[in-house]
Regions:
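Beta1/beta-strand and adjacent pyrophosphate-binding region of the FAD-binding site
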Residues: 2-16
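Conserved N-terminal/central alpha/beta ligand/cofactor-binding core
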Residues: 5, 22-133, 139-143
Length: 145
């Protein structure tokens, strides 16, 4: 089914998988993002927030490396809040709550404009390993990528 080789296959299209696929493709690797549902690429969990002490630090680091999570969060924000204001400035941490549907839509728009990136809707069910190297993945629909 697949007549091209991929340098990187990202399994899972949540916001972390979307970020990984974008980073890989932007570095020039021919990348495939495999997701169970193309309509939910980039979808947030039930708590539609980015930020906080731990996750906020990661978002800032991703942003500094050219990632999109912070940008997509800003574009789809419905509330901004600085957490831990009752503590010292070292503990302050920004958090944004986003519109879940808009967040997924914006991520999809970003990914569709990314060169070197293809999408495939299916479920990865294992790994194809040859000589201790991962060479591909089998899918639930019986394809080998």
């Amino acid at each position: 089914m697949f007549d091209s080789q991929f340098d990187v296959i990202v399994v899972g299209g949540g916001h972390a998988g979307a970020e990984a696929a974008a980073a890989s493709a932007n570095l020039g690797a021919k990348t495939l993002l495999v997701t169970m549902n193309l309509q939910t690429i980039g979808q947030m969990s039930c708590n539609p927030a980015m930020g906080g002490i731990a996750k906020g630090q990661i978002v800032r680091e991703i942003d500094a490396m050219g990632g999109y999570s912070g940008i997509v969060s800003d574009l789809t924000a419905i509330q901004f809040k600085m957490l831990n204001k009752s503590k010292g400035p070292a503990m302050w941490s920004p958090r944004v709550q986003s519109d879940r549907a808009q967040f997924a839509l914006k991520w999809r728009e970003v990914l569709e404009r990314t060169p070197n990136l293809d999408f495939y809707q299916d479920m990865v069910v294992g790994l194809i390993v040859e000589k201790n190297q991962i060479k591909g993945v089998p899918t639930g629909l019986g394809n080998k990528i």
